Amino acid sequence: DIADVPLIILARTDANAAKLITNDHDDNDKPFLTGERSPEGFYYVKAGIDQAISRGLAYAPYSDLIWCETATPNLEEAKKFADAIHKKFPGKLLAYNCSPSFNWKKHLNDDEIASFQQEISKMGYKFQFITLAGFHTQNIAIFELAEKYKKEGMAAYSRIQEQEFAREKDGYTSVKHQR
């Protein structure tokens, strides 16, 4: 850009699960229109991996990497998307949301969970992330602290503080919240 700031363009598609779009002007969307409209005027579409692939292919020339949002951690679906994109755009970088919305244990066993990221990396998903990881981690931590604090008082908090002190040697800096 004009300020010489590095920029990465990430194109995201939710077409795998989205059932509505705002208009019918894009030729890319036309094969997926159902012909029906919602009471609010939106257009119903056939959601699924094929529409997500279609969107990904449309985005590929204009983006640095492509993110296909998924409903479950599904290696077959991830491979189908990656293969379709790479067939026309070899080496195109892909992004994968290792989503906190997934019930990982419901869909994968422990070994599959442990190898999931390595497997999708082989497919070209080089940017892997967990949206809202901090939100979920923070909330369960404070919930557990509240339970323990109710039963044990300051002893519960003191144990957390000791963990913080012990982690300073590793680079943890939040012991001092006032600097």
Model-derived segments and spans:
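Alpha/beta enzyme core
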Residues: 1-102, 106-129, 142-143, 147
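Conserved alpha/beta catalytic core and glycan-binding cleft of carbohydrate-active enzymes
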Residues: 110-179
